[in-house]
């Protein structure tokens, strides 16, 4: 699951994560690690926001940024973090993200609620054939007018799709070398990463109940591109996301027949993960 970009987490800070309902934090001590945000003394949450100091608000117990108790016998549970470019995950991801993400800066983080399960949301994300139907004309605005030649491949816990570069009028020289107009990466379960020249959009879907999901939305701007390029990217992505949300809510349940290879791959992974 996506956690953050390295540049989101200041050095010597601990940041609670919405993906874990703020029960887990990510710590940056020069290396990254996940820490429980629950005090083992009386099960109170510790941090409310990014902080340099971990002190439980209930009885005042303090911990260092490695999770060790300070003048107390307790310690916080700790888990590894996996770095992929500057993208941080709570799991190993079997494919390096192909685009340099070091210039991305977080513009917005929000939570959306969708009346669809994470599996249905992922199905829509993986589905290539719906693009010219559900998103007719949307991606034309960023120079993607033909999605017939999308290429893709799978890896152990996800897949990645590449849209060939078409019009490069707003693409900086550093990004022209990729020859990619867009890149869409799925990391199971529930993480969807979308790159357009000048922007990165990440969605992380979790069940809230049997029929709905909470989706953490992270929107990043590449600081090498102009504000106008960002605003166009943001408009295109929000339009496509609203269309995909509506489509997901219209799907009764994940399909079991007529599955393309990307959906089949996700089904096999889901079955093996049980």
Locate the predicted segments by residue.
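C-terminal catalytic domain of Rieske-type non-heme iron oxygenases
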Residues: 37, 95-274
């Amino acid at each position: 699951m996506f956690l953050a970009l390295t540049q989101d987490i200041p050095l010597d800070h601990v940041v609670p994560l919405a993906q874990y309902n703020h029960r887990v934090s990510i710590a940056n001590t020069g290396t990254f690690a996940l820490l429980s945000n629950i005090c083992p003394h009386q099960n109170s949450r510790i941090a409310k926001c990014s902080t340099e100091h971990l002190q439980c608000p209930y009885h005042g117990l303090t911990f260092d940024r490695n999770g060790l108790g300070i003048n107390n016998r307790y310690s916080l549970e700790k888990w590894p973090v996996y770095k992929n470019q500057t993208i941080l995950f709570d799991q190993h991801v079997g494919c390096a993200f192909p685009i340099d993400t070091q210039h991305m800066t977080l513009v917005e983080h929000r939570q959306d609620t969708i009346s669809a399960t994470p599996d249905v949301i992922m199905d829509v994300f993986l589905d290539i054939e719906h693009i010219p139907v559900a998103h007719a004309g949307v991606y034309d605005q960023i120079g993607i007018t033909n999605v017939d030649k999308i290429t893709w491949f799978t890896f152990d816990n996800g897949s990645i799709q590449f849209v060939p570069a078409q019009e490069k009028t707003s693409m900086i020289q550093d990004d022209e070398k990729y020859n990619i107009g867009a890149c869409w990466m799925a990391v199971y379960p529930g993480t969807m990463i979308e790159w357009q020249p000048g922007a990165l959009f990440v969605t992380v879907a979790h069940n809230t109940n049997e029929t709905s999901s909470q989706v953490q939305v992270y929107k990043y701007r590449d600081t090498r591109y102009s504000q106008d390029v960002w605003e166009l990217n943001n408009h295109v992505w929000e339009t496509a996301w609203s269309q995909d949300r509506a489509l997901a809510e219209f799907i009764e349940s994940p399909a079991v027949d007529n599955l393309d290879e990307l959906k089949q791959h996700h089904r096999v992974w889901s079955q093996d993960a049980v």
